[in-house]
């Protein structure tokens, strides 16, 4: 049996958190490893602490958690930004990261790659961006993101939406900045352009599933104010209506949101490559 360490934001409500849990779930399916977890923060995002969540996966993560002091691991999987990887944690160290969403990479991160034994990225785009930035001698593998089986289940119940608009655009993403120019997901301008394109159309609605980093009541108040301020500035009149969906949803609820018959189109105008995890 190989001793494996997963160092990652395994409990975080974030894209990196989802990616981390994908790695852990795969390792959990193997019979030839014993797993330890070193759970990290990811920005100011909330943590999942209910052991029953994700079909019990959160509980499996928590009961293996701690901050390991020994270096006796055979393999480490580290889901972080490259400059946060620690090549001393195991005999063989795997760095996993989404790196960048655009076509430019920090040259310093290539040095971090050279200290690991191999690198895993989610797309060919990211791999090519790294290789275009400079020479990396360590192998880089592309392992795509996955999506939950619930997304394909035909009997998923539509997520309840109290709306009265017939044709609705769905936007899913977190506010990652305080103005249109530093928001990576580009939600500010997405709202602006949809309001301009469908100005005065009472049959069109915009469903915005978002937050400002957390799923709390305080975050909802902050997020609601941001959305109100944006809409008051970019929308002339009462239409299109903007409907806010906030809070942490179970996987089946997210699937139900996508499958709600009121949702006719998914809109993503993110500034770079994005997955909406």
Each model region followed by its residue ranges:
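N-terminal pre-catalytic "stem/leader" segment of glycosyltransferase-like enzymes
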Residues: 1-73, 195, 205
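Acidic donor-binding loop of glycosyltransferase active sites
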Residues: 256-277
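Donor nucleotide-sugar binding/catalytic pocket of nucleotide-sugar-dependent glycosyltransferases
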Residues: 117-128, 136-153
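Short beta-strand segments
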Residues: 6-8, 37-41, 77-80, 144, ...
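Conserved catalytic-core segment of nucleotide-activated headgroup transferases in glycan assembly
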Residues: 19-21, 26, 132, 152-256, ...
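Short hydrophobic "strand-cap" motifs at the C-terminus of beta-strands
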Residues: 7-8, 96-97, 122, 143, ...
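Extended catalytic core of nucleotide-activated donor transferases of GT-like folds
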Residues: 5-7, 45-131, 252-253
